């Protein structure tokens, strides 16, 4: 689990004692996508329009995804960007290529472009060294009476 993380707030802003590691962010991301795979239905949206309704009427405003990886990496499926003065530019990136799902985490990048470039490098490296394994001789389990 997340052995090197201590959150002191839920918003992710800098605070004394608020700390995590790239590995722990990857664990947290894995849990999120495993338990709630529908998150990709939202994290892959590039732009959308929201209608805000009040007694005075309706108003629309546009939202653009802060995760530029969605537009720059063919297999990107999400997931979460963030930046603070102490953490720098961070990204927990998920991708799915040939039914292989990978997570890449970049922390403390100097800017948004480099966090995306670093995630692309990590994902490309991962896809270059992994392949899907299919067990041609699945284990036969014995049943004991």
Give short role names for the model-derived ranges:
Residues 2-6, 10-145:
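Domain-terminus/edge residues, biased toward the C-terminal soluble/receptor-binding domains
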């Amino acid at each position: 689990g997340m052995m090197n993380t201590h959150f002191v707030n839920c918003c992710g802003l800098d605070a004394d004692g608020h700390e995590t590691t790239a590995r722990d962010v990857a664990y947290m991301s894995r849990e999120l996508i495993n338990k709630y795979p529908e998150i990709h239905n939202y994290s892959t949206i590039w732009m959308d329009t929201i209608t805000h309704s009040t007694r005075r009427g309706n108003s629309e405003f546009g939202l653009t995804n802060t995760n530029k990886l969605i537009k720059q990496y063919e297999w990107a499926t999400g997931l979460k960007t963030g930046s603070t003065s102490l953490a720098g530019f961070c990204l927990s990136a998920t991708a799915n290529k040939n039914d292989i799902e990978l997570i890449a985490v970049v922390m403390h990048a100097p800017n948004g472009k480099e966090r995306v470039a670093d995630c692309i490098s990590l994902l490309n490296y991962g896809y270059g060294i992994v392949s899907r394994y299919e067990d041609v001789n699945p284990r036969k389990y014995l049943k004991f009476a």
